[in-house]
Structure formats: C-alpha cells, structure tokens
C-alpha cells in the first residue's frame, strides 16, 4: 500500500515521502499512530500544494533576510561604556547589549542569539560583528564602543 509519511519513521521513511509499505503495517500501525496517510490522488495533490507553499515561504524568508542585511550593513550602533587606561573597558560589551542598543537607536528588533560575537568586546573603537539572519545570509554590523563621560 502506498502511504504518505506525516512524520519521520525510523527505517521506513521521512516526512513528506511517498512509499510502499505492507498493508497490515500501514493499517495497524502507521494510520493508528498518525504517522502516515493513504496516498490517494487528493492527498498527493495536497502534499504537492504544501511543498510549494513551504518553498514560497522559504524564498520569502531568504528575501527578507537579504533586505535586512542591506539595512544592517548601513548602520552603526554606538554603545557608551566606561573605560580605563589605554581604552580597555571596565567589563565588556555582550551580544545582548548590542541587540538592545540596535533596537533603541534604530528601532530594529533582533534576537541576541543571531549576533555571533566570538568574544565579548573589551576595548573602545569600531568592531565588525557578524549577524546570522538566515542559514545562507550573514550581515556585518558596525559597533562603535565610545567612552562614557
């Protein structure tokens, strides 16, 4: 019997795949557990429509990420911090502080987990910080740490 998998089933198939399985296995296990549905022409059409919808959404997310990348690369975020001799900061600037400053200064809300700061910023000056907006899109944000007076 041909079935469409609704969830990944170890050793049998992945979500969205159409496979041939034993009738008893399909009726007694896959259908009852909600892991698969019968591969009727209507269900196959619905699956194709679902896949197209997901592709459109993925393309839209990628386009939005590219647009946001262009915006971010034009901006400079300024963060005031207390510093000692030689421009070393008391404490450090974290990705959370960068995200908060970005929202306060430019009105762009960005998740701090998307800001890929290898180590916290510990000195005054300009730093280029990578921001992963999408698996395929990484922007570079300029962060200016200036001395707080």
Curated annotation (Swiss-Prot):
Give any Gene Ontology cellular component: ribonucleoprotein complex
List keywords of the entry alphabetically.
Ribonucleoprotein, Ribosomal protein, RNA-binding, rRNA-binding
Q: Could you tell me which InterPro entries the record lists for this protein?
A: Ribosomal_bL9, Ribosomal_bL9/RNase_H1_N, Ribosomal_bL9_bac/chp, Ribosomal_bL9_C, Ribosomal_bL9_C_sf, Ribosomal_bL9_N, Ribosomal_bL9_N_sf
What's a GO biological-process term for it? translation
**HAMAP family from the entry?**
Ribosomal_bL9
Q: Which NCBIfam families match?
A: L9
Q: What is this protein called?
A: Large ribosomal subunit protein bL9
Q: Which organism is it from?
A: Geobacillus kaustophilus (strain HTA426)
Traced from the root, the source organism's taxonomic lineage reads:
Bacteria, Bacillati, Bacillota, Bacilli, Bacillales
Q: Which gene encodes it?
A: rplI
